[in-house]
């Protein structure tokens, strides 16, 4: 019988961190299971090529169901199926979130998750190019750097925002988040620095770490309500492995709830309808899905704006309030890039520039459920984008602000025709229709195994799944509410904090008995 102290399911943004930290103790054995491949696809390394990874072998390439509030469109949701998970296919933007996000998590009944509590974990993982400070760390595994060769239009975007009265903010992860600046990136020596590159590849030779790729976990194994192991498929065969300590589920906001439900943890009605025996009645599994969404404003350019090979495309940004409540976190984040990023129906050949208003705290909530009892079927994803009218209105407000920026003097020498939404789309009604027609994901799904103490919570503040022993969820799915900005950095922080929580309660090993299939 094969046994490890810990089994980690998913070598993604959090899973790689947990694997690194738990194996720092040479006596602790860890099995890391990843459904995807090693991260050796060359486009992973090249920052500019991240969109070329979509719908390839390193992408789960999920689609939502038809979304009723956005003209029944199905939204394509790329997710990393590779060592490093989505940190190997994302746009590499390092945004931690707003301090209010984490203070709110604590206020929702999650002690230990306030901004002051989590800041040390952000700093621990970081090797900040600018050096150490009150807010930043050096010597950590993850390289955080300034853009190497930002486009002149990205600089102009910041200048235009400052001229409009927004503050110049060189550090969105520092004293304040509001304002305009260039994004810092998880790049090292001009190449993507995923969590696989930062936390996993340097330690692959640790004798107490076993990493298995192309391993699809099919279910968790229980004795009563104690988690004793996992079952997975590898090279066409079914394997069972067992744990002395804990199973750590780090499969992401779509696949962590999917695996819990396949294993009998979730809404009894849903599980019984699919013939899955119920282990724990936990109705919150797969609920509370939140994501950032955006609708672009795109211009043709009057001159060639080819971004550098080290560009992540979304080079500059602006965090702002469309409402008067300045005590709240910014409700809109703008991304700017020196490319003609337009919806397919609006796309034009040639050079351009674009900006998207991203809704930081959508009111709409979605869900993840099972399509069948087969682990090979993709989950049923319903985002419910723009169910709330206020979400539409905020995106329209964001489009209007971008138009002001693009019509400023800073863009005079570059401004060509507006191709999306188009210069004739001016009324609020027309802009609202445009938003419903084109709004798209910013690839930040979270919240489907939320942390908390209310009846819909899935994990407690130490990330332990309610109703069973020896099982934690450690990834973006535990966020009670989505953070303000890109979600990769807070997911890495969750991995760092979880590793300490796990180490603090390591217990005397118990012998697990074999479960027959």
Residue ranges and their predicted role:
Residues 1-517:
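N-terminal redox-cofactor-binding region of secreted/periplasmic oxidoreductases
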């Amino acid at each position: 019988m094969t046994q490890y102290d810990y089994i980690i399911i998913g070598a993604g943004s959090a899973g790689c961190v947990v694997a690194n930290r738990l194996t720092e103790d040479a006596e602790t054995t860890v099995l890391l299971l990843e459904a995807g491949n090693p991260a050796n696809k060359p486009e992973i390394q090249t920052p500019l090529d991240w969109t070329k990874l979509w719908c390839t072998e390193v992408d789960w390439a999920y689609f939502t169901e038809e979304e009723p509030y956005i003209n029944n469109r199905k939204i394509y949701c790329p997710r990393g199926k590779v060592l490093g998970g989505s940190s190997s296919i994302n746009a590499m933007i390092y945004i931690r979130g707003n301090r209010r996000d984490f203070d709110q998590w604590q206020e929702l009944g999650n002690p230990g998750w306030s901004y002051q509590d989590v800041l040390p974990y952000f700093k621990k993982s970081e090797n900040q190019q600018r050096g150490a400070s009150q807010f930043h760390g050096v010597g950590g595994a993850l390289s955080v750097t300034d853009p190497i060769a930002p486009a002149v239009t990205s600089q102009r975007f910041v200048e235009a925002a400052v001229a409009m009265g927004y503050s110049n903010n060189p550090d969105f992860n520092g004293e304040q988040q509001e304002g305009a600046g260039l994004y810092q990136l998880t790049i090292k020596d001009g190449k993507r620095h995923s969590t696989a590159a930062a936390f996993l590849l340097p330690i692959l030779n640790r004798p107490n770490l076993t990493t298995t790729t192309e391993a699809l976990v099919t279910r968790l194994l229980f004795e009563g309500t104690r988690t004793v192991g996992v079952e997975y498929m590898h090279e066409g065969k079914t394997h069972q492995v067992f744990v002395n300590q804990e199973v750590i589920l780090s499969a992401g906001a779509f696949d962590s709830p999917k695996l819990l439900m396949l294993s009998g943890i979730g809404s009894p009605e849903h599980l019984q309808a699919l013939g899955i025996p119920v282990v724990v009645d936990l109705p919150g599994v797969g609920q509370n899905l939140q994501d950032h969404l955006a609708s672009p404003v795109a211009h043709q350019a009057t001159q060639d704006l080819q971004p550098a090979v080290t560009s992540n495309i979304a080079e500059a940004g602006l965090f702002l309030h469309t409402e008067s409540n300045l005590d709240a976190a910014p409700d809109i984040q703008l991304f700017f890039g020196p490319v003609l990023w337009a919806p397919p129906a609006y796309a034009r050949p040639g050079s351009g520039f674009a900006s998207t208003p991203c809704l930081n705290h959508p009111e709409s909530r979605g869900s993840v459920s099972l399509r069948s009892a087969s682990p090979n079927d993709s989950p049923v994803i319903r985002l419910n984008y723009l169910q709330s009218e206020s979400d539409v209105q905020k995106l329209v407000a964001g489009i209007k602000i971008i138009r002001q920026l693009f019509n400023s003097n800073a863009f005079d020498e570059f401004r060509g025709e507006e191709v999306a939404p188009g210069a004739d789309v001016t009324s609020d009604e027309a802009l609202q229709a445009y938003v419903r027609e084109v709004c798209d994901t910013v690839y930040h799904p979270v919240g489907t195994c939320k942390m908390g103490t209310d009846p819909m919570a899935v994990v407690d503040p130490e990330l332990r799944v309610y109703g069973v022993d020896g099982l934690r969820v450690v990834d973006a799915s535990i966020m009670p509410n989505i953070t303000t900005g890109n979600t990769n950095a807070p997911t890495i922080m969750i991995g760092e904090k979880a590793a300490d929580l796990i180490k603090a309660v390591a217990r005397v090993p118990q012998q697990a008995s074999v479960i027959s299939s």
